[in-house]
Amino acid sequence: MIGKVLNRQDLKQIAFDQVAWVLGKNPFASSTMYGEGHNYHPLYVAFSPQLVGALPVGIKTLGHHDIPYWPTINNAVFKEIWGHTTGKYLWILADL
């Protein structure tokens, strides 16, 4: 993490803010991580139960509009669990 390398608190704070965003401090007031944070929703899993700590592949947009959109419906397009998403999140936490 560049904030750690450069010893810059402002850059470290950006990383902390991004972690908070994932866990519910976002325009949706909803955690994107299943089972953790505030107001989390089920994620799409085809062959397993919901996995606590899993993160979805991304955030959906509302058509061609650049507005916050995180519907409660469960869909493989934006709420599917991919291992790399959760892995990268854990990597960031290790650096903080």
List PLM regions with ranges.
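Aromatic (Trp/Tyr) and acidic
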Residues: 1-96
